[in-house]
Amino acid sequence: MSKSENLFAAARELIPGGVNSPVRAFTGVGGTPLFIERADGAYLYDADGKAYIDYVGSWGPMVLGHNHPAIRNAVIEAAERGLSFGAPTEMEVKMAQLVTELVPTMDMVRMVNSGTEATMSAIRLARGFTRRDKIIKFEGCYHGHADHLLVKAGSGALTLGQPNSPGVPADFAKHTLTCTYNDLASVREAFELYPQDIACIIVEPVAGNMNCIPPQPDFLPGLRALCDEFGALLIIDEVMTGFRVALAGAQAYYNVVPDLTCLGKIIGGGMPVGAFGGRREVMEALAPTGPVYQAGTLSGNPIAMAAGFACLSEVAQPGVHSTLDALTTQLAEGLLDAAQEAGVPLVVNHVGGMFGFFFTDADSVTCYHDVVKCDVERFKRFFHLMLEEGVYFAPSAFEAGFMSVAHSEEDINNTIDAARRVFAKL
């Protein structure tokens, strides 16, 4: 047995499913998950010493690559001064200044510890500010594991939401309306059914939790217009897309102004950090200046703030996003060409430093209903054959891929060459 297999067997006796986040268990592809010993640049090294070109990037944060010296040194320096104070620090102020400079729609920002905390708190704030209860989310979009977000559509487009996890009370789920991504008509229908009850829309500007689905040109502006028409807030969940699709996020790339923005992943440089922020009048409804409560013992943790500040300072340098986009485009076009040469039907979506590919005969993939029609079994075979080639894609057909500026053109070419060999076997 490999060391990963031994570790997984031991982990399953101690940790539910052997992992601390479900997708890591390889349940979407089968087999034994890789146990990682270390990472550097564009590469992961597993417990058995094998190297992999990594397109997961810790599920998004590693836009600069693994073990970046500026981030590592910032963490070491901060740790020497103490790990947690439970009191304000100068670095929190510097971090808030940097975030609000980089994302102009955020007048104020509150630091938290995860993307889930960010979305959960932003929705509570929207409900408190508007004094309304219902929210709109989109089928196939993921905004963390808060109870009111673990909701699927009912039997009809506008039936009350149903929990998609045991432990979520139906009384919570009934306040969540689930619409179809890239379908403005379904959103208008929801507003017309509940014109005085909807507090907010929360949306991934590029849906990264049903692989990678960019918005149609009219979708995000249409959501903004509907929120304005019906007095709801627009929350853009940039946990994945923030500082990755563009420096100021997908909201800048697609030219839409939200009321609130949620951030995570890159904002922590690999440490557990989330944030939410937006219009001053909305944010000032948050405790202690307002009545909407939110708190956290480790929020604004000095180590995490140091890592995040170092990461964002590097990400803001000229050329980072043009490099990221060029590398992602090279990979996306190369995978598509290789698949076509082998006669394998494939759709590839990409924007900024995100990408996704779908084994399907369809011309395009634009929503959850398209995604679930794709050939998951073919993806599983592709994943494992690429893993044998030393290339690590997300172990799920429903997760986006992430590029870093640490990837070289040689890494991309080697990946495409490996894919060409694998497509020939499919």
Swiss-Prot record:
Keyword set, alphabetical order: Cytoplasm, Isomerase, Porphyrin biosynthesis, Pyridoxal phosphate
Record-linked CDD domains: OAT_like (cd00610)
Pathway: Porphyrin-containing compound metabolism; protoporphyrin-IX biosynthesis; 5-aminolevulinate from L-glutamyl-tRNA(Glu): step 2/2
Sequence positions bearing N6-(pyridoxal phosphate)lysine: 265
BP terms from Gene Ontology: protoporphyrinogen IX biosynthetic process
Cofactor entry: pyridoxal 5'-phosphate
Principal subcellular localization: cytoplasm
Subunit details: Homodimer.
Protein name (record): Glutamate-1-semialdehyde 2,1-aminomutase
Species the sequence originates in: Cronobacter sakazakii (strain ATCC BAA-894) (Enterobacter sakazakii)
